[in-house]
Curated annotation (Swiss-Prot):
Function: One of the primary rRNA binding proteins, it binds directly to 16S rRNA where it nucleates assembly of the body of the 30S subunit. With S5 and S12 plays an important role in translational accuracy.
Similarity section: Belongs to the universal ribosomal protein uS4 family.
Protein name per Swiss-Prot or TrEMBL: Small ribosomal subunit protein uS4c
Subunit structure: Part of the 30S ribosomal subunit. Contacts protein S5. The interaction surface between S4 and S5 is involved in control of translational fidelity.
Taxonomic lineage from the root: Eukaryota, Viridiplantae, Streptophyta, Embryophyta, Tracheophyta
GO molecular function: rRNA binding; structural constituent of ribosome
PROSITE patterns in alphabetical order: S4
Keywords: Chloroplast, Plastid, Ribonucleoprotein, Ribosomal protein, RNA-binding, rRNA-binding
Main location: plastid
Gene Ontology terms: biological process: ribosomal small subunit biogenesis; translation
Region span, Disordered: 17-40
InterPro entries linked to this entry: Ribosomal_uS4, Ribosomal_uS4_bac-type, Ribosomal_uS4_N, S4_RNA-bd, S4_RNA-bd_sf
Gene of this entry: rps4
Length: 198
């Protein structure tokens, strides 16, 4: 299944707020709200909606999400969460401080991002502690990123990242702490949804 490129407000109406998908808010529709509240919601639908929240928030394909759930289930020692794995992707790490996830994904795809002085053009590249993320030295590219920095730097940076706006450089300090993840989701329901496949 490919990445979703359809109407985003349609998804927001169904799954509620997803900061990674869009910052727009749908208008209240009283008729549809009354109809939906009278329906009985099945356990399958509850699990499906939690899974879809995770998928649409991070812009993942079905295959990518299943892969992260499998990695999280196989991890030994401390419990590794699939949501923490997705937060450590290059497109997500780069987007914090530089712009939106979709914009970051495009910059990565076009080969504008370097990790530890090596060009990386895979948005799903897993970042690790001590990684240094920089951009190619292009004046036009820096102007675009400077504009994004002014827009997105109002929010406090998560503790797993350090960002130097003047040098256009980011550092991965550690694996992200769950309290910094701005998506409220019941991961157990996602694991239960995939229990027959993972």
């Amino acid at each position: 299944m490919s990445r979703y490129r359809g109407p985003r407000l349609k998804i927001i109406r169904r799954l509620k707020t997803l900061p990674g998908l869009t910052s727009k808010r749908p208008k209240n529709r009283k008729d549809s709200m009354n109809r939906s509240s009278s329906r009985k919601i099945s356990q399958y639908r509850i699990r499906l909606e939690e899974k879809q929240k995770l998928r649409f928030h991070y812009g993942l394909t079905e295959r990518q999400l299943l892969k992260y759930v499998r990695i999280a289930r196989r991890a030994k020692g401390s419990r590794v969460r699939s949501i923490a794995i997705t937060e450590m992707r290059l497109d997500k790490s780069f987007s914090i401080g530089y712009g939106s996830t979709s914009g970051a994904r495009q910059l990565v795809n076009h080969g504008h991002i370097r990790v530890n002085d090596h060009m990386v053009d895979i948005p799903s590249y897993p970042c690790k502690p001590q990684d240094v993320i920089t951009i190619r030295d292009q004046q036009r590219l820096r102007a675009i990123i400077k504009k994004n920095i002014d827009l997105f730097q109002r929010d406090k940076l998560p503790n797993h990242l350090t960002f130097h706006s003047l040098q256009y450089k980011g550092f991965i300090n550690q694996i992200i702490d769950s309290k910094w993840i701005n998506l409220k989701i019941n991961e157990l329901l996602v694991v239960e949804y995939y229990s027959r496949q993972a």
